């Protein structure tokens, strides 16, 4: 079965990678959909995010990466993907995820939720971006494969 893991991945975290590893073990094909919201600003370009996910999942041959600016349900219909996978870190994620699940289900797309390991419950792209801006340690919350890219971003931001 082909599944979609949608998100902004700005940048990818160890939580994202843990979910991808679990999904890759269960499904034939996992597409990471980097969705662009024109109303949001991002620290990394779509191309940078695609490359980071590619690097972090190089050992997972069933994981593919795509970039789109439309609706997740429309992407699923176009690509004949019947199932979304989403991560739940804690109770704070539930209201949005419940609303999104209902919206997608009404459009014929089911959602499977994966709960984060307790050690990853506080890991978020928001926290990674904060640490990048503050010049703080990153290795405990991001895949090692993308550390050089993130450290370069830290240097670039300090130089501004």
Question: How would you describe each model-predicted region?
Answer:
Residues 1-160:
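Nucleotidyltransferase catalytic core that binds NTPs
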